[in-house]
Amino acid sequence: MPESQRQPYFVLVRPQMGENIGASARAMWNFGLEQMRVVAPRDGWPSTRAVAMASGAGRLLDTAQHFDGVSQAVGDTSFVFATTARGRGLTKPILAPEEAMRQAAEKIAQGQKVAVLFGPERAGLENEDIAGANALISVPVNPDFPSLNLAQCVLLMAYEWRRAQGQVELARMELAKTQWAEAIEVEKLAQHYEERLEDAGFFFPQAKAPGM
């Protein structure tokens, strides 16, 4: 199975600006995601503004699928996540991005097709869009300013997807034009310093030398 088919579909629902579609494509491609679907973009499709903003990620726009409605966009998928910034009073699981993408990875590994819905910039997804979703994704943002730009939300989900794939290093050490010393080399260096310090009279009084 091609790598692109082992990924979730990121579905942009009624995006209002071509620039945000292009920025979302860049965010997806930053983390190796290729499957974009676009539902009823306000400014039409294809979008020259999206292409201009996508820069090196234009390939995603070339292969992006266009749909008239959400139900058509997710019709071939078996599990749908919907992103939301506020509670909807619906009886659905509400997951943090990390857990949602972990579950998405598990389902895709089992052969399921998974979609993630992203709403319009101004007000987000409508309840009608969310009704058919299996679970909601809620980002723990500042409650006094919960609004995320479309591309920001896409970037966050794409990053968590990559983490779920085990492709994010939590820490590393880079050695600039050098390599790790062997234990014997470290020991010899310590002996060298000790000899030089002793020659300089650093270990005084001599009785305290072993503890210094």
Identify what each model region corresponds to.
Residues 1-212:
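Post-transcriptional modification and biogenesis factors for structured RNAs
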